[in-house]
């Protein structure tokens, strides 16, 4: 099975919602942006159990950005570790092609 980071890095030039289940059984959603160099930026936990288009847009407005030229992938891996993303609690990556519309598909990598 490909790692979550590898799966995200293969999806070029997309916004994603990364959905995980926390240890207290709550769903947490993280926003991720990729480009042709792989993962570019991501946001901390901002919303849960809500796929409303306005909420999706707010994730990116509140997102914490990191430079891909300054060890970003290491930072992203540490981020995934810090929220304890594993194959057991990783739900889906939802591509968001248009910030004004809902995700048009859901990809499962586990």
Q: Each PLM stretch: what is its role?
A:
Residues 12-30, 52-55:
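Short aromatic-glycine-(Arg/Gly/Cys) micro-motifs in beta-strand/loop hairpins
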Residues 4-6, 10, 81:
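Proteolytic processing junctions in secreted/extracellular precursors
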Residues 20-21, 33-35, 86, 94-96:
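A structural detector for beta-sheet-dominated domains
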Residues 49-110:
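Short, mixed-charge low-complexity intrinsically disordered segments
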Residues 26-48, 65-67:
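A short, exposed loop/beta-hairpin motif centered on an aromatic-Gly-Thr core
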């Amino acid at each position: 099975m490909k790692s979550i980071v590898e799966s995200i890095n293969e999806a070029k030039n997309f916004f994603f919602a990364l959905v995980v289940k926390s240890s207290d059984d709550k769903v947490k959603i993280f926003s991720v942006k990729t480009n042709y160099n792989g993962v570019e930026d991501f946001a901390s936990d901002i919303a849960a159990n809500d796929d409303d288009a306005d909420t999706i847009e707010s994730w990116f407005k509140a997102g914490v950005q990191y430079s891909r030229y300054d060890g970003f992938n290491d930072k992203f891996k540490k981020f995934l570790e810090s929220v304890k993303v594993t194959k057991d609690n990783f739900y889906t990556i939802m591509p968001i092609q248009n910030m004004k519309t809902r995700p048009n598909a859901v990809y499962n990598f586990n």
